[in-house]
UniProtKB/Swiss-Prot annotation:
It holds the Pfam family RsmI_C. Gene3D superfamilies: Cobalt-precorrin-4 Transmethylase, Domain 1, Methyltransferase, Cobalt-precorrin-4 Transmethylase, Domain 2. The gene is rsmI. This is Ribosomal RNA small subunit methyltransferase I. It catalyses: cytidine(1402) in 16S rRNA + S-adenosyl-L-methionine = 2'-O-methylcytidine(1402) in 16S rRNA + S-adenosyl-L-homocysteine + H(+). Its EC number is 2.1.1.198. GO terms for molecular function: rRNA (cytosine-2'-O-)-methyltransferase activity. Keywords: Cytoplasm, Methyltransferase, rRNA processing, S-adenosyl-L-methionine, Transferase. SUPFAM superfamilies: Tetrapyrrole methylase. It is found in: Cytoplasm. The keyword Signal does not apply. Belongs to the methyltransferase superfamily. RsmI family. Catalyzes the 2'-O-methylation of the ribose of cytidine 1402 (C1402) in 16S rRNA. It comes from the Bacteria.
Length: 291
């Protein structure tokens, strides 16, 4: 039965076509039969890093002609690929992991091939974004994928400020050496917001941490191993809270304190003085910043 389906997939591969092939994001067993069929039959395999792709091909006994198509040479390589397609060749495109053109090279190549009149066919498979969302437990069909978080704190804060009231989950990628700073910036704006950190998805040390932003910070501080590996963050939707319930005096006190203190500290002090909820006061201050 296995061979029957593999042969059927192989028979459907035709020349003069660019196949955009999703590859495993960690566990090699996640490769699809169709992906194997395309890679076996491909005359040319465009790889982000040929060394990484060579390991994948070797694991399945596939020998293919690898060419490097990276961000810096994608535009010029696209013309060569069009030439291969003109000769009737089967061309496959892969990234190091997951689906090409999603935070990886591939978009320019696909566009150029389409413009030249050739077919671009997706070969679906692993996706870190969908894998993280599938276990996050968020309801509804709407979500926003941001890609990698900006490297500079100022840019991150500006981006996060836009998400204070987001009513939908937000998925993003982050690197181990920046995760601490990113969580710190999040904590300044929404320390009580729920977050899931998915680490090393499908790999040996796969981990999913869920809690408030502050709790995730604490977990990473307590165990340095949790800051290693590739990461996907899922920021849960903001809770719909209103500030009309706050007394006028509490709002005035909060306004005075935020002029002199960091927002989090001002909210804590205002809560002690007024007896109002710390989160409601904190969110009130954020609403002022976003006006």
């Amino acid at each position: 039965m296995f061979q029957k389906h593999l042969q059927k997939a192989s028979d459907s591969v035709v020349g003069g076509t660019l196949y955009v092939v999703a590859t495993p994001i960690g566990n090699l067993a996640d490769i699809t039969l169709r992906a194997l069929a395309v890679l076996q039959k491909a005359d040319i395999i465009c790889a982000e890093d040929t060394r990484v792709t060579a390991q994948l091909l070797s694991a399945y006994g596939i020998q293919g002609k690898l060419v490097s198509v990276r961000e810096h040479n994608e535009r010029q390589m696209a013309d060569k690929i069009v030439g291969y397609l003109s000769d009737g060749m089967v061309v496959a495109q892969v990234s190091d992991a997951g689906t090409p053109a999603v935070c990886d090279p591939g978009a320019k190549l696909a566009r150029r091939v389409r413009e030249a009149g050739f077919k671009v066919v997706p070969v679906v498979g692993a996706s870190a974004v969908m894998a993280a969302l599938s276990v996050a437990g968020v309801e509804g069909s709407d979500f926003y994928f941001n890609g990698f978080v900006p490297p500079k704190s100022g840019e991150r804060r500006k981006l996060f400020a836009k998400w204070v009231r987001a009513a939908f989950p937000i998925v993003m990628f982050e690197t181990p050496h920046r995760i601490g700073a990113t969580l710190a910036d999040m904590a300044e704006l929404f320390p009580e917001r729920r977050l899931m950190l998915a680490r090393e998805i499908t790999k040996t040390f796969e981990t999913f941490l869920s809690g408030t932003v502050g709790e995730i910070q604490t977990a990473l501080s307590a165990d340095g191993n949790q800051s290693r590996g590739e990461m996907v963050l899922v920021l849960y939707p903001a809770q719909d809270e209103k500030h009309e319930g706050l007394s006028e005096s509490a709002q005035n006190i909060m306004k005075i304190l935020t002029a002199e203190l960091p927002t989090k500290q001002a909210a804590e002090l205002a809560a002690k003085i007024t007896g109002e909820g710390k989160k409601a006061l904190y969110d009130l201050a954020l609403s002022w910043k976003n006006k």
